[in-house]
Swiss-Prot record:
It catalyses: Endonucleolytic cleavage to 5'-phosphomonoester. This is Ribonuclease HII. The gene is rnhB. Belongs to the RNase HII family. Its EC number is 3.1.26.4. It comes from Anaplasma marginale (strain St. Maries). A divalent metal cation binds at D29, E30, D122.
């Protein structure tokens, strides 16, 4: 794992796949898959400008400090084309986390605003039924700069969202744990019970008998605070995109 975390991604795989019919190559990644609270968030990113100084600093979001992620987020969103998609807790409960993560990826791509020739997806499984050519890449956020950029956009967007949720549910310290099952988070679950933002079908939450259902927040209002454009699609789902 350490080897992947320290690896600097590049455009090597993009260049290998580029051809006469493939020029617009988009990276896709998600974050929040293993959390026990909050949505799963995906981002799709197309980097048309490779010579910008910030490009060399892009790497897997997990290998970056929060400060560095925020810095790169601002630079990527200023120069790249991107889309963000959310799959909410009720969708995770209705389907499962894998399906929900694929839903978020589809929404990110649908709101990218760019016609992709090829989509690079982090992981071993891609959403079914995409109208674009797709290639999955295991540990793609450590290999492809396009996927690494998507990991940064998804991570910062979700972290900002969870910090705003923290204002409504301060007992769970989501501003620190971002909805993941830390020891402190689990202790708060035992003490206060679960909220509407907890994933009830996930074992750590399901095992707790006490419940404290709260009204779900207005997602569009929260998303607007992240600094990303947030139109609402035909299903009423909040999405994000950059022109």
């Amino acid at each position: 794992m350490a080897g992947f975390m320290n690896r600097m991604p590049s455009f090597l795989i993009e260049d290998q796949l580029r051809s006469g019919t493939i020029s617009v190559i988009v990276g896709v990644d998600e974050v929040g898959y293993g959390a026990i609270a909050g949505p799963v968030v995906a981002a799709a990113v197309y980097l048309p400008e490779r010579e910008c100084d910030y490009i060399k600093d892009i790497k897997d979001s997990k290998a970056l400090s929060s400060k560095k992620r925020e810095e790169l987020f601002c630079k990527i969103t200023a120069h790249a084309k991107y889309g963000v998609g959310f799959a909410r807790v009720r969708e995770i409960e209705q389907h499962n986390i894998l399906v929900a993560s694929h839903i978020s990826m589809k929404r990110a791509l649908q709101n990218l605003g760019v016609k992709a020739d090829l989509v690079l997806v982090d992981g071993s499984r891609a959403p079914a039924g995409l109208p674009w050519a797709v290639k999955t890449i295991v540990k793609g956020d450590s290999i492809s700069t396009s996927i690494a950029a998507a990991s940064i956009i998804a991570k910062v967007t979700r972290d900002r969202f969870m910090r705003r949720l923290h204002e409504q549910y301060p007992e769970y310290a989501w501003n620190q744990n971002c909805g993941y099952g830390t020891k402190a988070h689990m202790q708060s679950l035992k003490l206060y019970g679960k909220t509407a933002q907890h994933r009830s079908t996930f074992a750590p939450v399901k095992q707790l008998s006490s419940e404290c259902e709260g009204a779900p927040p207005e997602q569009l209002e929260l998303l607007s605070s992240t600094g990303i454009k947030t139109p609402v699609d035909g299903r009423g789902d909040a999405v994000a995109t950059r022109d």
